[in-house]
Each structure stands twice: as C-alpha cells, then as structure tokens.
Amino acid sequence: MTKIMKHPIPIAIAEHALMNEQQYQQDYQLSLQDPDRFWGEKGKIVDWIKPYTKVKNTSFDPGHINIRWFEDGTLNLSANCLDRHLKERGEQTAIIWEGDDPTESKAITYRELHHDVCQFANVLKNMGIKKGDVVAIYMPMVPEAAVAMLACARIGAIHSVIFAGFSPDAVSGRIIDSNTKLVITADEGLRAGRTIPLKKNVDDALNNAAVVNVSNVIVFKRTGNIGHWQSGRDLWWHELVADASADCPVEEINAEDPLFILYTSGSTGKPKGVLHTTGGYLVYASLTFKYVFDYQPGEVYWCTADVGWVTGHSYLLYGPLSCGAITLMFEGVPNYPAVNRLSQIIDKHQVNILYTAPTAIRALMAEGDKAIEGTKRTSLRIMGSVGEPINPEAWEWYYQKIGNSKCPIVDTWWQTETGGFMITPLPGATELKAGSATLPFFGVQPALVDNLGEQLEGVCEGNLVITDSWPGQARSLFGDHDRFEQTYFSTFKGMYFSGDGARRDEDGYYWITGRVDDVLNISGHRLGTAEIESALVSHPKIAEAAVVGTPHNIKGQAIYAYVTLNHGEEPSPELYTEVRNWVRKEIGPIATPDILHWTDSLPKTRSGKIMRRILRKIASGDTNNLGDISTLADPGVVEKLLEEKQTMSIS
C-alpha cells in the first residue's frame, strides 16, 4: 500500500485547541493506568443530584459480563441538557431547525426548549407513563422528536427511537420486543420533497395481533394530511400540550437506570435492542463531543444524522446539548432541492463544525464543483465523518472542496453499542491521515487479534476488539443478556468484539477495514444479512436466499441477493420488481436489494452451511482466486454461478 502522508495540525487550530498531543498522551496513559481516578474526575462534566463514590465496576469474564459505572450516583439527563444552562445561556439558541423546504427554518432557545420539554413530559405523565415504561418514537427530523426524547428522559421513561425509514413490519417488531406502552409519531414526514406516511405505517404496525400494550398514539401535525384516525387511541400533539403545565420537576435517576433502547441489525435474525443507561452514557457523550469536535462556546454545530440512529442520539442531541452547544437539525437530504444544498446550509447558518457520512460525501463528490457552487463555506473550522470507513479519495475531496483545505477531519470509529467515539483524532492533538480513524479516545483499549484470539503486535491486520470497559458502553440487549454475551463476548473471551476488522500502521494509527461478520453497511446504516434473507424467503415464490454486500461507490456497499425460486416458478422482470418491493415493504427502502441473482443452487458445505465467502467474491467480480472449494457438497455450483453472473453482466 502506498504510504499516505500526514496532514499536520493547522496553526489556527493548535493555538486554541482544548487538547494538544502531549496532553492527550498524558491523559490517555492515565485513563488506562488509573481508570477510577481518570473517570472519577471526568465524570464531573455532568451535574449529579447525588454524587457518585464508586466509579468503575466492570467484568468481561465469561458468564459474568457486568458493566457498571458511577453506580451509586443519581442525575437527570434532561436537567443536564436544559435546566443547568438556563441561567447562563437561556436565551442562546439550542436547536437551529432547517426544513426540507429551504424557506422553512427556525431557532429554538434553551429556555423555549426547556418549556416545551416540561410541557410534553407532563403530557406523558398525564397519560400514565412512568419511570421504566418504554415509549416508541417514530418521528421525522423535527424539533418535536428531540422534545419527545428529552421529555422521556426527564421522567425516567425509556425511549426507543425507530428510524422513520423503517416499514410497518419493522416498527411492530420493535414495539413488540420492547413492550412499548405509547407511540409518538407524525401524520407524515417530509424528505426530498416527498411525503413519508408515518401515521399510516404506525396504524399498520399496530394491526399486528402481538402488539398488546399500546393504548395511545400521539400524532404531531407536520403536513396536515390526516388519513385514518382511531378515536380514543389517536391524539393530537398540539391539543395535548395546550392543556399541559410547563412546570415539571426532574425525576432523580440512578446512573445505571435505562435511558434508551436502540435497535440495531444482528448477523443472526431479529434486530437487537441495544440498552444504554444514563450516567456513563451521558458522561461519555459529553466528553467525546467536547474534545473530538474541540467545541468552543457559541459555535454552530451540524450533525446530519437522523435521530433514529445512535449518531442522532449522541451527537445531534445529547452530547451537544449537555455541553450547551448550538446544534443544527436538518429535515432533508444534502442534495435537495439542489446539489449544493449542504453547502448552502453551511453558509446560511454559518456552520462552524460539520459532521456527516461518507455516503453523503461520495454523492456530492460525484457532482464535482456543482456541490459547492455559489457558496463560500468559510465559517467551517472542523469537519467529521461517521458511519463507515471513508476512502482516502473521498476524504481528500471533503478536505479540499467542502473544507477549503483548512479544516481538520475527525474520522470517527464507533458503534451503536459503544455509545460514543472509540477511535478518533482530536483536532489539536492528532496529525491526520486520509482514511484512518487514527488513535483511541481516553479509556479505550483497542487490540487486534487473529482468528484464535491471540493479540497481534505492531504493524498488522486483524479483528478489532476492546479489552476493557468504558463508560458509554451498552449494558445489555433489552430482555436478553445471554444474547448480549453471545454476540459481543463469546468470539474472543474476555474481550468486546466489534465485528469489524482493522489494520494498524507504523504510527500506531488504526484503519478500519469493514465488517468481518454478516452485517452490511449501507450508506452508514447497519443491516443484518439474516434479516434481509428472512424477508426474501417469506415471499411465497422464493425457496432460498443468500445476501452479501458488494462495493458501491456511493453507498459503500450494495445489497446483492442470490435467490432460488420454488419449483415451477420462473424468473421474470415482473417478479424482479415484485421481490424488490416485497423486501422494501418487509423492512424498509434502505434494505431493498440492488441486484437479484436468480440461481438454482447455492454453494454449500456438506453440513449445509452456505459459503458466503465465495458468494461475496462472485458478486464483486473478484473471481481469480475463489480459494478452497473442495469442502463444497457440489463444487460444480460455483461454475454455474459464474456463468449466470457473466450472462447478467452481458444483459
């Protein structure tokens, strides 16, 4: 591999940065050698009702996975994000909202947000929601989504935010698994000029007979297109808040009380409800936000992520708001109504820090200079990348074109399960390499291991594991601690396995190489191959399916599905469309297969295991070295698949 040159730290950044290289090295060493002392001090970044005396109580031992931080302390997340800022910055903007339509935008101050959250928290209480109840939030990117989340946290209810792109079946599955009591949605969402039928999707989801505990649906009026309305069950947001008091004292919450559940794709079957608790999560989200973005008071920060993903939780809302930041929430997409929309928003709101995904960057890069036409972007100071590894070409384009070659890029590696950044540059402390996530954050102990779990030293490539706990770590999977241990701690004993592969270079920098398990990364969104395969096989004409990811220059990975039809069924253009729409309905648009490869048989071992390694190589056209196929029950299948692929390419 060609050596990638380092980008030095710009002098303008170094002069005012919160952290330099020497300080980083010193603090990082302390965080490993004496985590109790380090986190005992850093835990004070948030306000505690009852201060903690215990800091770290964790175990990665087989059969005893236990993760507890600040466990005797109490606090309230909503108070940390709102109440504590009222005296100093009550009139400062908390959220800038930019609508899908460029003519729609508004600013909400900390005082106004506090008022709205208290009102809505009282609405929840009036509806019988209490501490420990689960509330599902299926909302578009409007400030009310943030209000709903903060209101849940204020009273100790657990929120389960469901991405607005998910289908009714995906919504009902999450409602059933989490035992949801109340659903909050909108009549419709708006995205790139199109409407998303959120309320209709909720209606369809609640028709599932296994949904038993949802007694009410609160509906925010976004477009005014009402559709079906179930009297008694469905209630308008604006009518409920009109009668609610704006006085709502915070609930005292233990550090280890649940804060939220967020469902993420598993490599085996149904999605996993990742459970985060309150204290450690908020400390970690706050500290990582402050140092990784080198946040300075009064700066405008824009994270383009949806609230339905963990990035929207940690780095659109909770991290920024707990630090008293100005956070921008965008309803639309970066290339609508014009391909320079992202750049226009940067100029319009004088954005100082931009945090977006490689998918968006690659889509804009494909437009060339049109993506920045008529804009200056001179307000930008720091930029970030999230969701998947960023290829060096896209990194350089982002750096030169969007950032005018002056803004450090923090390429952050982390996961839903980690709660916050794990491997990331710090703007004033880390020289950058295009495409590398660089070095671990405080308290994070990464290691690379071979397939037997032996740690590899120096320059190497292997499975990325974390050898000790950190405060933002997920505590469990909702209602299934055994699956939590099985998923993350059984592959390599005594270590958290990320499911990602990585390379370490001569400077100790980490380069994430992508998933090593059966999870796809589509436009920064994780989707389990098993989930897509289940959806395909539920189609009445399909006998078997195997899904793999193949490189895609915009989305990172495309979904390539090998499909075997039932006896007597024949492939056709109509069936091709029908099957793609079927998956779209079962899971959501994000999971729609890009390519269907009709085939009579799949490469299987004698024990019946599908050899995905071969399918991945065929899908991506990497067929020169298919490796050992002697273990296949019928090696002739491979030749047939290659011929089919050739025919598909020609057609």
From Swiss-Prot:
Residues bound to CoA are R191, A192, G193, R194, T311, N335, S523, R584
Q: How is it modified after translation?
A: Acetylated. Deacetylation by the SIR2-homolog deacetylase activates the enzyme.
Major enzyme class:
ligase
GO BP terms in the entry: acetyl-CoA biosynthetic process from acetate; chemotaxis
Sequence positions that bind ATP: G387, E388, P389, D411, T412, W413, W414, Q415, T416, D500, R515, R526
Keyword tags: Acetylation, ATP-binding, Ligase, Magnesium, Metal-binding, Nucleotide-binding
Residues reported to bind Mg(2+): V537, H539, I542
TM region positions: none
NCBIfam families per the UniProt record, alphabetical: Ac_CoA_lig_AcsA, PRK00174.1
Entry protein name: Acetyl-coenzyme A synthetase
Source organism (scientific name) = Photorhabdus laumondii subsp. laumondii (strain DSM 15139 / CIP 105565 / TT01)
Its taxonomic placement starts with:
Bacteria, Pseudomonadati, Pseudomonadota, Gammaproteobacteria, Enterobacterales
